[in-house]
Amino acid sequence: LLKKYRFFDIGNDNFYFDDYATRAEIERNEREFLKPSLESLLSLVRHHEGQFSFSLTISGFALRLIEDCCPDTLRLLVDLADTGCVEFVGMPYNHSLSSLTDEAEFGRQALKHSQEIERLFDLKPTTFRNTELIYTDNIGAQVYRMGFDTMLVEGAGRSLDVKGPDFVYFNPQQPRLRILPRNESISRMLEDALKDKKLFTPKYFAERLYEVDEYDDVIYLGLNFEYFDTTQYHNNEVLVFVKNLIDKVVDSGVYKFQTPGMAAQEYQPVGPFRAVAPVSGMNRFHDMTPWQGNELQQEALHKVASLQSMVATANREALSEIWERLQCSDYFYYMGTEFFNNPTYGYKPNPYKSPYEAFINYMNILGDLERRLGERIEQDKTDALSDDQIRDIISHYEKEIALLKQKLAN
């Protein structure tokens, strides 16, 4: 979370993030849904003895917060990794939009995230899920070149050729990259069920799964952890719903749970998944509107991307980390106008009163970061001067001052 940063703070305040609020939020998340849901999922994995598998996608920054603030949750994640039934999926380290702005930066962030997964869980991600399922053919091809063999995407109808989302596809530029599209309708039905237990029972939802065409191969259900928020109901009814649903599906024998990597290896691709223009899983149009839909968002994205060369030249880890954190997609989402403060859209609460307030706060911070980068670059230039060069510069200015004094005297 960013702190409130005014124009007059530029040059006077080097701290941009509200670390206290961020820590409070991650601790609240641990209490309300992270720890209870992970405990429940671990119990289900152990109970079903290999018949229940799933994947997790957690940003690198979130993992760092969990490691620093939530040791119990980290232990649960390690225990889940040790079962062999949970796949940790790769992504950009800070949940950024770097795949849309710079190929090298996108690759760097993906590598950094994979290294974090390996460090914490001794697992190397082979499946990739871009921020909010953003995908194009070019992005998919780059993901393959980065070493991933499977990619999760949104099953937007306009991207599929003949068949529906319940199949494995391939990237048209890199046919060895397997593409798994999310079944949007069933995923949203599950999200609705978790938000309101009166809508669907586990039995009803399981029956909808059984109605899927018997010739379909795989149903990719994807949802955000926030939907496991146990404070929505009393007595952890969200987790009871999930447990009953998983039990019914496993016991039926109609379907088997698999990680994305397992499914991609078991089923042959049925065709290419084509997306020349970017598609995402965030809104009903499956486009970039949530982050690039207005001039405020576009200007902010352009500005933060434009600092990349200064960040590289300054070559200071602390400044690089700040710049990386400021690329988080949430900051641009908060500047959205069409869906601002719409509780029916997405799942992210907006801490700002208006898109303009979010924009001004963000741009003030970027302005100060740009100032600091410029100062560091100039300082490095000065530090790099030899003693003779410094003496020459001093001599030059002394002569200039003498000439000015002479003119004033005349």
Please provide the spans of the model-predicted regions.
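Active-site and substrate-binding clefts of carbohydrate-active enzymes
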Residues: 1-32, 36, 167, 173-177, ...
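Short, well-structured secondary-structure segments
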Residues: 3-102, 126-129, 149-154, 259
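Well-ordered, non-membrane alpha-helical segments in soluble/globular domains
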Residues: 27-42, 70-75, 107-110, 196-208, ...
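Short, solvent-exposed loop/turn segments at secondary-structure junctions
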Residues: 60-64, 93-96, 133-136, 157-158, ...
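Acidic, His- and aromatic-enriched active-site or binding-groove loops in soluble protein domains
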Residues: 73-90, 123, 144-164, 169-181
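Core alpha/beta catalytic barrel or barrel-like domain that forms the active/cofactor pocket
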Residues: 85-96, 120-131, 179-186, 218-224
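Alpha-helical scaffold elements lining the catalytic groove of polysaccharide deacetylases
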Residues: 96-119, 176-215, 232-235, 281, ...
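Catalytic domains of cell-wall/extracellular-matrix polysaccharide-remodeling enzymes
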Residues: 111-165, 228-242
